[in-house]
Amino acid sequence: MREVRSGESSARSEIDVDKDSAMPKYVIEREIPGAGKLSSQELKGISQKSCGVLSKMGPQIQWLHSYVTGDKIYCVYIAPNEHMVREHARQGGFPANRVSEVASVIDPTTAE
């Protein structure tokens, strides 16, 4: 990160994040039979457990969000390395069947 000095373009934010210095983003595939049928209370409990482990591990690893499907949960994390993502899963007792580093993010604006 670098601070934008006075006199630089006012269209820029106060802090400009250099793409090369950003931490990697990971997608974690967790095989959990019946995940799509978990109650809101069960999902809350899983989320609380994850957040508890994250608070012990420190600010370098962050959970962004998760997608719950029929038998899997796909979680998106920011972390310095895959080992830290797998350590979070180990400490929380969560499966981490596949951990993939995100190479790029595209959306409809990519086509413009």
Predicted regions and their residues:
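A short linear hydrophobic-aromatic micro-motif
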Residues: 59-65, 98
